Amino acid sequence: MTRSLIVGMDDTDDSRNALARAAELARAAGLRLVVVHVRHIPVCAEMSAMTIEPARQNLDLIEAEARQAAEGVLQGTGVDWEFVVRSGDPAHALMVMADDRSAAAIVVGGRPHKAAVSGLAGSVGAAIVHRFHGSVLIVRGGDSAWNPASASGPVLRAVPPQPVGSAN
């Protein structure tokens, strides 16, 4: 079984940037890329069927946009990939997927600059970094797009217990 690299994907520029970096890593390490989109509706007791249905329709639209964005980013990369949809808490869903696939790492996008100053990479990235036992890469987008040729870049935190692509 080919090892995989899990990347969280929504309809944001940050996740597209993270996906592009994940594709580079997957190609270099010979990993299968698993693009995970997580549908999340916070439900409260006051929500009725009339408010839940429009929220679900909006999630369908966001999912379609995320899938289309993934196809656009990965077209022509030569990377073996799949698009997977899960429901629930995004951080938890990404960690479960990584465990299920014995993934080499999880890659997510992070908010640029202001979040870095506060010490947070975004709620999903921060939750994964604090709770996941494996490798995590948070790629910051915005004005400081990652340049693999430079020693510096927007990577906020990478926690590798072993080299990406190495056997367990």
Give short role names for the model-derived ranges.
Residues L33, W81-E82, V136:
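Hydrophobic anchor at the start of a short beta-strand
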Residues S15, E63, A121-G125:
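Short, conserved glycine- and acidic-residue-centered signature motifs
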Residues A105-R131, A145-P148:
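Glycine-rich, Arg-bearing micro-motifs that act as flexible, cationic patches
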Residues G109-G110, V136-R140:
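Short beta-strand elements of ligand-binding domains
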Residues T2-A49, R131-F132, V155-N168:
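Small/aliphatic-rich secondary-structure junction motif
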Residues R39-I106, V117, G142-N168:
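Charged, low-complexity cytosolic intrinsically disordered regulatory segments
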